[in-house]
C-alpha cells in the first residue's frame, strides 16, 4: 500500500494532476528539495510547484529501486528509492508516511542527488565556492 502511494506520487506529477498529487501529503508535510534552501511546508511547495503543474507534465521521476520499512505499530513507514530523471539522471527520494483515516499519507519527502565518493571532494569544493 505504501509503495502504491509513492507510485501514485510519481504518476500524478508526470501527468500534472496537481489536486491528487498534493492530496497524497499530510497537511503539515514537508518537502525537502535538492537545494539547501528548499525546505518547504505544503503551502510553500505548492506555490513553488504551481507553474510546473500548469504544463502537461510537472516532472518525471521513475523509481527503479525502493526499500520500505513499516514500524511495529503499523502506522508509520519510511522509505528510500533510487529514481531516474531525464534532467538529473539518478536521484534519490526518501521520506516518511503515516497511516491516517484516509490511508497512507506522505509526511516528509526528501529529494536528493547521490554523489559518488570519487567526485565528492570536487562537489564539496564547488558548493563551498558558492558560499559567501
What does each model-identified segment do?
Residues 1-27, 43, 75, 118-132:
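Short, low-complexity N-terminal intrinsically disordered segments enriched in polar/charged residues
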Residues 36-38, 68, 113:
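Residue-level detector of flexible, active-site-proximal loop/helix-junction positions
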Residues 1, 30-31, 43-90:
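Surface-exposed, charged secondary-structure patches
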Residues 28-30, 36-39:
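Short active-site-proximal "capping" loops at secondary-structure junctions
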Residues 22-23, 32-33, 61-62, 107:
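Short, hydrophobic secondary-structure boundary micro-motifs
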Residues 35, 82-83, 95, 110:
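A mature extracytoplasmic/lumenal domain signature
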Residues 90-122:
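Short beta-strand edge/turn micro-motifs at domain boundaries
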Residues 31-33, 117-118:
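A short acidic, helix-capping loop that chelates divalent metal ions and anchors anionic groups
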Amino acid at each position: 500500500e505504501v509503495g502504491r502511494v509513492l507510485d501514485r506520487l510519481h504518476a500524478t506529477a508526470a501527468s500534472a494532476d496537481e489536486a491528487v498529487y498534493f492530496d497524497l501529503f499530510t497537511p503539515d508535510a514537508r518537502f525537502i528539495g535538492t537545494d539547501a534552501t528548499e525546505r518547504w511546508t505544503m503551502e510553500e511547495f505548492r506555490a513553488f510547484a504551481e507553474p510546473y503543474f500548469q504544463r502537461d507534465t510537472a516532472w518525471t521521476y521513475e523509481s527503479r529501486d525502493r526499500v520500505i520499512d513499516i514500524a511495529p505499530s503499523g502506522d508509520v513507514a519510511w522509505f528510500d528509492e533510487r529514481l531516474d530523471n531525464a534532467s538529473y539522471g539518478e536521484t534519490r527520494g526518501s521520506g516518511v508516511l503515516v497511516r491516517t483515516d484516509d490511508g497512507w499519507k506522505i509526511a516528509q519527502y526528501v529529494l536528493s542527488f547521490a554523489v559518488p565518493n570519487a567526485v565528492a571532494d570536487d562537489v564539496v569544493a564547488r558548493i563551498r565556492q558558492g558560499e559567501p
